[in-house]
C-alpha cells in the first residue's frame, strides 16, 4: 500500500492544477481537467464502474456493493485543484525516508529550511517518511493526498472482496480552493446518502463544523494628479485602501486567532494612485458574529465613500458557504462511525472545527451531509507543506474501515 500511495501521489502533484479566482469557466484551469482525465483512465484500470467526467471536470465512479445487506450508499470526495497562495507549477516532491527529527534543507540556494524550531509538530514524525516540496512551490497534499487515498482504498477493496461493503461512490471536484467546488456538483446523480471529504490535515483530524464564510472585494477610486500640483486635488486610492484596513480590528486576523475565533483576512491589496483593489475573506463559526463582521465591512465602506465622494468606494460582498454543523448534527452517527473506525486502527480522533472550508460545507447544505476526514498533510498552501506517508496509509485504512463498518452495522 505504501508504494502505491507514494507512486500515485508523486505523479498527481506534478500536474499543475492550481485554480484561478479570476476565471469564469469551470474548471478554472486546464490542468484540473488534465488530472481529471488521468484519474478517469486509472479508475477504469483498477476496475471501478460507472466512471464519468463531465464538461466541468467533475469525476464520479462507483464501487458496487458486494453484500446482500441493504447498506446506505456512502461517498468519498477530494478536490483536484491546489491553492492560489503559492505556485503549483513544476512541483518537485522530495522524499525523506526515516526522518531524523532535524532541519530539512528544502532548497540550499534559496536557504529554505523546514525546521522543527519553526514547526514543532515535525518532532512527531521522527522515523517516518516525509514528502516535502523543493522550497519553490506548494506540494499539493491539499488535496492530492485525499485523491491518492481514495484511489488506493478503492483499489484495495476491489482486490480484497472478503471485506464486505455497500455501494460506494467517489468524486473528484474542481475549484474547491476558490469556493466553487460544489457549484455544479450533481448531488442527485452522485446518489449517496452520506459522504466524506478526505481534505483534512494531520493524523486523526475529524471535522463536522466549518466557518461561515464570505468574501469582500473593494475597489477604491482615487484621483491621480501630478505630484507637483496635487494639493487639494489628488486622492490617493492606495491610501484609501490603507485607511480602510486601519478600520479592521488588527487582533481579529488569522495570525492572532485560533479555535472558535473568527477573523478578517486581507488576501491582497493592489493598485496605484488612481485605483486600488483590496480582497478580504471574512470567517466566523457563530452566525450572529458572522453577520456582524459583514456589517462592519459594509459600514466602513459606506463611511469612506461618504468621506471621499460618491463612487469612490465600491464593495462587492458575497457569502461563500455556511457552518455545516447544522446539517450534520441530525445525522451525527456518520461522525461516530468514523470515530469508531479510527479507534479500531489505533488512531485517536481529534474532533475540532475546520478553520477553513471544504466542499462538504456546501454539499451538506445541498442535502448531502459530508464531514471531513484527515488526509495527513501539514502546512498547507505554502512551500513548507509536507505529508507523512504513514499518515496517508492510515487515512486509506480509515476509508476502508468506514466502508466495512457501514456494512457491519446493518
From Swiss-Prot:
Pfam families: M20_dimer, Peptidase_M20. One of its GO terms (biological process) is peptide catabolic process. GO terms for cellular component: cytosol. Its EC number is 3.4.11.4. It is found in: Cytoplasm. It catalyses: Release of the N-terminal residue from a tripeptide. Binds 2 Zn(2+) ions per subunit. Zn(2+) 1 binds at residues 79, 142, 199. Its cofactor is Zn(2+). The keyword Methyltransferase does not apply. Disulfide bonds: none annotated. HAMAP family: Aminopeptidase_M20. Cleaves the N-terminal amino acid of tripeptides. NCBIfam families: peptidase-T, PRK05469.1, PRK13381.1. This is Peptidase T. It comes from Listeria welshimeri serovar 6b (strain ATCC 35897 / DSM 20650 / CCUG 15529 / CIP 8149 / NCTC 11857 / SLCC 5334 / V8).
Amino acid at each position: 500500500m505504501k508504494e502505491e500511495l507514494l507512486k500515485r501521489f508523486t505523479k498527481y502533484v506534478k500536474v499543475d492544477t492550481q485554480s484561478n479566482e479570476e476565471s469564469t469557466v469551470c474548471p478554472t484551469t486546464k490542468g484540473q481537467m488534465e488530472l481529471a482525465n488521468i484519474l478517469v483512465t486509472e479508475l477504469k484500470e483498477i476496475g471501478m464502474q460507472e466512471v464519468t467526467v463531465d464538461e466541468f471536470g467533475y469525476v464520479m465512479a462507483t464501487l458496487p456493493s458486494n453484500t446482500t445487506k441493504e447498506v446506505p450508499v456512502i461517498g468519498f470526495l477530494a478536490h483536484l485543484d491546489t491553492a492560489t497562495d503559492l505556485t503549483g507549477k513544476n512541483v518537485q516532491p522530495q522524499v525523506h525516508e526515516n526522518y531524523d527529527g532535524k532541519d530539512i534543507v528544502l532548497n540550499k540556494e534559496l536557504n529554505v529550511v523546514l525546521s522543527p524550531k519553526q514547526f514543532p509538530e515535525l518532532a512527531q514524525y521522527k522515523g517516518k517518511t516525509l514528502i516535502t516540496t523543493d522550497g519553490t512551490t506548494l506540494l499539493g497534499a491539499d488535496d492530492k493526498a485525499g485523491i491518492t487515498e481514495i484511489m488506493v482504498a478503492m483499489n484495495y477493496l476491489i482486490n480484497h472482496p472478503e471485506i464486505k461493503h455497500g455501494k460506494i461512490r467517489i468524486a473528484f471536484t474542481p475549484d474547491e480552493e476558490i469556493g466553487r467546488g460544489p457549484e455544479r456538483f450533481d448531488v442527485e446523480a452522485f446518489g449517496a446518502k452520506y459522504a466524506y471529504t478526505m481534505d483534512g490535515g494531520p493524523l486523526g483530524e475529524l471535522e463536522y463544523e466549518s466557518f461561515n464564510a464570505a468574501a469582500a472585494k473593494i475597489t477604491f477610486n482615487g484621483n491621480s494628479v501630478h505630484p507637483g500640483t496635487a494639493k487639494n486635488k489628488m486622492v490617493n486610492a492606495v491610501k484609501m485602501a490603507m485607511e480602510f484596513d486601519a478600520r479592521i480590528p488588527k487582533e481579529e486576523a488569522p495570525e492572532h486567532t485560533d479555535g472558535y475565533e473568527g477573523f478578517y483576512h486581507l488576501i491582497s491589496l493592489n493598485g496605484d494612485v488612481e485605483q486600488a483593489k483590496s480582497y478580504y475573506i471574512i470567517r466566523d463559526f457563530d452566525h450572529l458574529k458572522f453577520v456582524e463582521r459583514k456589517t462592519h465591512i459594509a459600514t466602513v465602506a459606506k463611511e469612506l465613500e461618504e468621506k471621499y465622494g460618491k463612487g469612490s468606494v465600491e464593495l462587492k460582498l458575497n457569502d461563500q458557504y455556511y457552518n455545516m454543523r447544522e446539517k450534520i448534527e441530525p445525522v451525527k452517527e456518520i461522525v461516530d462511525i468514523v470515530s469508531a473506525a479510527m479507534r479500531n486502527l489505533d488512531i485517536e480522533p481529534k474532533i475540532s472545527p475546520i478553520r477553513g472550508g471544504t466542499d462538504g460545507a456546501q454539499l451538506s447544505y445541498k442535502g448531502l451531509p459530508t464531514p471531513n476526514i484527515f488526509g495527513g498533510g501539514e502546512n498547507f498552501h505554502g512551500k513548507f507543506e509536507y505529508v507523512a506517508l504513514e499518515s496517508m496509509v492510515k487515512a486509506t485504512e480509515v476509508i476502508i474501515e468506514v466502508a466495512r463498518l457501514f456494512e457491519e452495522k446493518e
